[in-house]
């Protein structure tokens, strides 16, 4: 199988880093275009009346406090049936179409360049940098991997388009990586590949919840994912299997809840292998193979066994958030910054700083069924001493 790169993606003087076929990316504009939220008003009680401010302050209460929604309404950010509504006490009619336009804002810094590690007619594998979100959410609506995939001109031969009726206009990610996590991200070019790859990841999560021998689970999987991580403390055992369930807990600043170690959560399985014990720093370099793909699974599992990732701002020992008490925020300041949304002052899942890299994976190709391996080059801090020496030799150091 070939992994052909598009010729001339970048100038020769800007050659991609070792291990990459080519790089692409469009610099971010200073401000995004804002975003619109559309609702159709339905009255639960025919005898009751609901005002505009009541609707938004209850339906979107995690977005802003009551004064925040009053400000948005008076600033003309909401329309009702196509007309700007500036009266918070306006009575809503059944079936009214409500549109809230979140004003353009300057999103926090995020890298924009992506390295292509593998590419064929069905899928593409990217090396995602730390600090770049995969899909739009919260403050990051434009500065995402998905946006870069949409911005790139994916030139495909007409013969390919005619043969592949399921071809998509651009590749789409088929799994998650945390914003602070770097490394391998698989994206599908066709609807068939998307469905097949998504099924592989879902199958892993399902198998993690079954009482089966580890060897049987490994044989059943169509994809195996391996990460590198740097954790606090010295792990005594060379290998550790973690099976702590992961579920949602209440957490200020995260409306849908925060994923954490939770006895009532969903099954999750992580296999940890020690690579080096860095006793002078009281750190351990590890490889983690995940048999499921729960959100923030590695961060939670390592914290659960008493070895949080080095510099993880959110998860502490026990796999729980380090902070759980609400903090006062300045409504006026938050509106000025991001068009009306409050920035949580406490750490949230998207905050960076920890050292976690999706290093390599082996998968059954979604159309050929061939087993292939793809590797993302390691950051220096996540290399073993021997790997660092080998890298220095390659670079002529």
Swiss-Prot record:
GO molecular function term, any single one: pseudouridine synthase activity
EC number: 5.4.99.-
Keyword check for RNA-binding: yes
Gene3D superfamilies for this protein: Pseudouridine synthase
Keyword Transmembrane: no
Listed InterPro entries: PsdUridine_synth_cat_dom_sf, PsdUridine_synth_RluA-like_CS, PsdUridine_synth_RsuA/RluA, RluA_PseudoU_synthase
Domain of life from the UniProt record: Eukaryota
Keywords: Isomerase, RNA-binding
Catalytic activity: a uridine in RNA = a pseudouridine in RNA
S4 RNA-binding domain location: 64-114
GO BP annotation list: enzyme-directed rRNA pseudouridine synthesis
PANTHER family: MITOCHONDRIAL RNA PSEUDOURIDINE SYNTHASE, RNA PSEUDOURIDINE SYNTHASE 5
Family: Belongs to the pseudouridine synthase RluA family.
This protein's name: RNA pseudouridine synthase 5
Lineage: Eukaryota, Viridiplantae, Streptophyta, Embryophyta, Tracheophyta
């Amino acid at each position: 199988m070939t992994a052909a790169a598009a010729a001339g993606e970048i100038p020769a003087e800007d050659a991609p880093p070792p291990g990459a076929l080519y790089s692409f990316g469009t610099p971010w504009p200073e401000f995004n275009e804002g975003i619109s939220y559309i609702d159709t008003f339905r009255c639960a009680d025919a005898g009751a009346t609901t005002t505009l401010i009541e609707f938004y302050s209850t339906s979107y209460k995690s977005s802003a406090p009551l004064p925040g929604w009053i400000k948005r309404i008076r600033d003309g950010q909401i329309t009702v049936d196509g007309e700007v509504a500036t009266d918070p006490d306006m009575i809503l009619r059944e079936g009214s179409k409500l549109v809230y336009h979140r004003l353009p804002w300057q999103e926090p810094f995020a890298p924009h360049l992506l390295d292509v590690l593998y590419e064929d007619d069905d899928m593409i594998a990217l090396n995602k940098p730390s600090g770049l979100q995969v899909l739009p959410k919260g403050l990051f609506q434009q500065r995402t991997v998905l946006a870069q995939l949409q911005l790139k001109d994916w030139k495909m031969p007409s013969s390919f388009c005619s043969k592949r009726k399921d071809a998509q206009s651009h590749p789409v990610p088929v799994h998650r990586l945390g914003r602070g996590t770097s490394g391998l991200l698989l994206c599908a070019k066709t609807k068939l590949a998307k469905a097949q790859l998504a099924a592989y990841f879902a199958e892993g999560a399902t198998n993690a919840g079954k009482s089966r021998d580890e060897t049987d689970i490994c044989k059943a999987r169509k994809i195996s994912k391996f990460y590198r991580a740097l954790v606090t403390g010295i792990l005594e055992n060379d290998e550790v299997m973690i099976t702590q369930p992961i579920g949602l807990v209440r957490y200020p600043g995260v409306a849908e809840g925060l994923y954490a170690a939770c006895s009532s959560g969903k099954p999750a399985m992580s296999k940890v292998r020690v690579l080096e014990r860095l006793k002078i720093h009281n750190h351990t370099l590890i490889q983690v193979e995940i048999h499921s793909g729960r959100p923030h699974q590695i961060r939670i599992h390592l914290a659960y066994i008493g070895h949080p990732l080095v510099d993880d701002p959110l998860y502490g020992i026990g796999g729980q958030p380090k902070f759980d008490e609400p903090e006062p925020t300045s409504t006026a300041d938050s509106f000025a910054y991001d068009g009306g949304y409050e920035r949580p002052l406490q750490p949230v899942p998207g905050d960076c700083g920890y050292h976690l890299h999706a290093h390599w994976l082996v998968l059954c190709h979604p159309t050929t069924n061939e087993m292939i391996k793809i590797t993302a080059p390691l950051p220096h801090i996540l290399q073993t001493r021997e790997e660092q020496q080998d890298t220095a030799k390659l670079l002529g150091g």
